């Protein structure tokens, strides 16, 4: 298989400026806060991002909401504060104080962390997931300028970096759900690897909720029935077109989704699938495509988009890294009717991959805002985009 070499869009100056801006308040070391800084206006931020090349359905518009180096997972408080995890060592908060749909201030909440990809908000506290540890910042919205010292909630997750980024979210049961990816492309690891775990907010009650999951970096609960849905990335090195990434549904604990024995519900693994029957595992609800790298996903509960998008599922495709012809680099949407039937995903935001190999962005996560707009994080460009709709 040929590894494709991508052409980097010229944006070094923009990203360097963002790094200087965000790095100007480094404080006195790791895990310290810094005073807020004014963010440039939206028209300035969007300059150089080739947003004219991003294709959306009629009536939708995309703009740059904020520049955040290595931006990954997103979460939002009920009051609208946006929290951003990264693949670097920092965690940020963004506020829109005048409610004009543009980021007004950016706060650096913590630094010196080990890939703090995951962020989740509950009862005034921000939970942060690094490779092996869950931290908590209490009463964070009243302390953005001077963040508190992190409290260790749970520190017994594996330290493996392969598939070590952790997306986290609180479920309807009040537990914090935390994935543990397989520490490999394909292997037969023991617990807790290749699973989705959950713990109570205080770090007690560790439990493996589901198994047979290679690497999920996005999940959400369906607003219609409250059931858990998640993406899972298929294994590599079986060719360009198999196996597919998966969209899975886990309505109850104890389900096994097949890894490493069976992929996409119907392909036995050539090494570990011998003697296994794919019918013994839970198949995906949807096959999302091979190597598209399906990451963040959210059900849309807002009212800012047309009615047909109510309860629709948005999925960020980070894009392939080793496919002969690149795929992904987009956001797709699967509409859902009132009975809970989910349609096949179709393109929603495309254009970060052009001319076969010209990459100008890599979507990671999607997050609806209280005003009904949709945020998209991009760790390749160090940006967060905002999608709005108007007739």
Question: For the regions a protein language model found, what residue spans apply to each?
Answer:
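Bacterial N-terminal signal peptides that target proteins for export
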Residues: 2-13
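C-terminal motif of bacterial Sec signal peptides marking the signal peptidase cleavage site
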Residues: 21-24
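Beta-propeller domains with acidic blade repeats across secreted/periplasmic ectodomains
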Residues: 26-391
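Residue-level signal for mature regions of secreted extracellular proteins and peptides
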Residues: 12, 18-19
């Amino acid at each position: 298989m040929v590894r494709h070499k991508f052409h980097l869009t010229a944006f070094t100056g923009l990203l360097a400026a963002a790094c200087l801006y965000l790095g100007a308040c480094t404080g006195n070391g790791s895990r310290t806060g810094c005073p807020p800084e004014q963010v440039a206006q939206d028209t300035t931020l969007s300059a150089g991002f080739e947003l004219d090349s991003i294709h959306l359905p009629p009536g939708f518009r995309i703009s740059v909401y904020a520049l955040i180096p290595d931006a990954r997972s997103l979460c939002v408080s009920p009051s609208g504060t946006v929290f951003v995890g990264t693949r670097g060592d920092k965690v940020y908060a963004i506020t829109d104080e005048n409610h004009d749909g543009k980021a007004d201030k950016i706060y650096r909440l913590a630094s010196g962390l080990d890939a703090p990809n995951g962020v989740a908000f509950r009862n005034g506290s921000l939970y942060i997931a690094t490779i092996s540890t869950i931290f908590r910042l209490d009463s964070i919205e009243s302390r953005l300028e001077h963040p508190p010292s992190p409290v260790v909630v749970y520190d017994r997750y594996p330290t493996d970096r392969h598939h070590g980024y952790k997306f986290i979210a609180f479920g309807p049961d009040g537990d914090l759900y935390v994935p543990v990816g397989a520490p490999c492309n394909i292997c037969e690891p023991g617990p807790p690897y290749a699973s989705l775990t959950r713990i109570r907010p205080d770090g007690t009650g560790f439990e493996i909720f589901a198994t047979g999951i290679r690497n999920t970096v996005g999940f959400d609960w369906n607003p219609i029935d409250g059931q858990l849905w998640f993406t899972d990335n298929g294994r590599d090195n079986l060719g360009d077109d198999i196996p597919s990434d998966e969209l899975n549904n886990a309505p109850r604990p104890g389900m096994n989704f097949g890894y490493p024995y069976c992929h996409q519900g119907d392909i036995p693994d050539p090494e570990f699938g011998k003697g296994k029957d794919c019918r013994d595992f839970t198949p995906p609800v949807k096959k999302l495509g091979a190597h598209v790298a399906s990451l963040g996903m959210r059900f849309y509960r807002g009212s800012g988009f047309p009615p047909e998008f109510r309860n629709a599922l948005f999925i960020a495709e980070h894009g392939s890294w080793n496919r002969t012809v690149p795929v992904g680099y987009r956001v797709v949407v699967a509409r859902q009717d009132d009975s809970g039937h989910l349609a096949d995903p179709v393109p929603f935001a495309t254009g970060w991959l052009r001319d076969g190999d010209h990459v100008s962005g890599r979507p990671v996560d999607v997050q609806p805002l209280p005003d009904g707009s949709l945020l998209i994080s991009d760790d390749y460009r160090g940006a967060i985009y905002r999608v709005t709709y108007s007739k």
